[in-house]
UniProtKB/Swiss-Prot annotation:
Species this protein is from: Lactiplantibacillus plantarum (strain ATCC BAA-793 / NCIMB 8826 / WCFS1)
Gene from which the chain derives: glpF6
Membrane topology field: Multi-pass membrane protein
Motif NPA 1 per record, residues: 56-58
Keyword vocabulary terms for this entry: Cell membrane, Membrane, Transmembrane, Transmembrane helix, Transport
Locus of motif NPA 2: 172-174
Lineage of origin: Bacteria, Bacillati, Bacillota, Bacilli, Lactobacillales
UniProt name for this protein: Glycerol uptake facilitator protein-like 6
Amino acid sequence: MRKYLAEFLGTFMLVFLGTATVVIAKGDVLAIGLAFGLAITVSAYAFGGISGGHFNPAVTTAMLINRRIDAADAIGYIIAQIIGAIVASAAVKSFVSALGLSATLLGQTDFPKIGSGMAFFVEALVTFLFLMVILNVTSNDHGNADFAGLTIGVTLAFLIIVALNLTGGSLNPARSIGPAIFAGGSALSHLWVYILAPEVGAILAAFCARVMGSED
């Protein structure tokens, strides 16, 4: 139960701090990227020692494929992550209402400037790169646990900065599910991209990490 609570709290912190910054930063790409990067770094150091610090169903999928977590825990982690994201988005909605902002501004992800195919590719690619860093930096053989949280946070920040104006830079199904439930509209109808594409990227990264010897 402690592990699931850690995943809930870590995901809550990531989604709440990240999407709240999206709301108040008004398109400031650097601020948004740094917010998500710092949030996951803090969450990793605060809760990673308890659960491993996934905070993302795509990360859990990769860890399951590479046998770093069993199926029962993987299911529990993903449920905790999604619930954490939904509760975080509910908190952001209250935050938005208190500020008198539009109720549709919840930090949701969407891709109004590109097609669904390109959006899928972008999300799969950035998630693949993100997972390659995670799987290698946390490797028992050649990882560096002392700097893992910082490395992962910096990587997430840069990848979100790159992808933000294309897809919103999700890299995380839970991060998109939470806001989409409350925002509705195209954020909800396009949610399949933000669920499937990161999972594809994670699966590819898991197998690539095996080839590189990260899972020996």
